[in-house]
């Protein structure tokens, strides 16, 4: 919470390209913590800490607010673009994100379909509650993506029960394709 108050958190954007057209179709919003001395603290360190202390909700709100402040005008001018945002497990387990987004989208006049939400398999603690909250996000127009698929416990059969638009396969599996004998037959 102190990092937010001190202005040390920033949202960076990793572009997303369509491989066929080679056009940029959107970006993923990434939270970064830059210390006063200029060093970056790895999200692998500060995100779990924020989850354990209950401060992750403030960080999620910060990302949502900042991205719409920074990119709202761009999104309004380019309705085909979208930004994806990572949600923590606690964000998925309550309907609060839908309420926060409705207020921010109305304020910035951005369409719900232009903000996608990414959750990890590990974030789907209570599947019944997660399904209900993710479906509510989809019902108003948001896309739902599973990030780092393959690193958790979800099977494809389990995923069929969830309101998911896209699977993002974990990088470790993609990097091994064609190089590792065990994965060379994966198509």
Per-region residue spans from a language model:
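Residues at alpha-helix caps and immediate loop-helix transition turns in enzyme cores, especially N-
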Residues: 42, 96-98, 129-130, 155, ...
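Conserved long alpha-helical elements within nucleotide-processing catalytic cores of c-di-GMP signaling
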Residues: 47-48, 57, 135, 184
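Catalytic core of bacterial c-di-GMP phosphodiesterases, primarily the EAL and HD-GYP domains
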Residues: 23-28, 53-132
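Short, contiguous acidic/charged loop-to-helix segments that flank catalytic cores in large enzymes
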Residues: 50-54, 177-183
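Active-site core of bacterial EAL-family cyclic-dinucleotide phosphodiesterase domains
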Residues: 1-49, 86, 118, 146
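Nucleotide second-messenger and two-component phosphorelay signaling modules
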Residues: 2, 6, 18, 36, ...
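The catalytic core of metal-dependent phosphodiesterases that act on cyclic dinucleotides
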Residues: 102-177
């Amino acid at each position: 919470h102190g990092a937010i108050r001190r202005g040390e958190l920033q949202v960076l954007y990793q572009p997303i390209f369509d491989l066929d057209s080679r056009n940029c179709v959107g970006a993923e919003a990434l939270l970064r913590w830059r210390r006063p001395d200029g060093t970056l603290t790895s999200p692998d360190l500060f995100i779990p800490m924020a989850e354990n202390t209950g401060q992750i909700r403030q960080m999620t709100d910060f990302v949502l607010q900042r991205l719409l402040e920074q990119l709202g005008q761009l999104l309004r001018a380019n309705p085909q673009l979208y930004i994806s945002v990572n949600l923590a497990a606690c964000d998925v387990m309550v309907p609060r994100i839908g309420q926060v987004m409705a207020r921010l989208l109305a304020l910035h006049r951005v369409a719900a379909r232009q903000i996608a939400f990414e959750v990890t398999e590990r974030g789907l603690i209570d599947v019944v509650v997660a399904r209900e909250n993710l479906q509510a996000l989809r019902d108003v127009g948001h896309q739902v993506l599973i990030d780092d698929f393959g690193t958790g416990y979800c099977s494809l059969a389990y995923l069929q029960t969830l309101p998911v638009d896209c699977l993002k396969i974990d990088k470790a599996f993609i990097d091994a394709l064609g190089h590792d004998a065990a994965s060379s037959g994966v198509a």
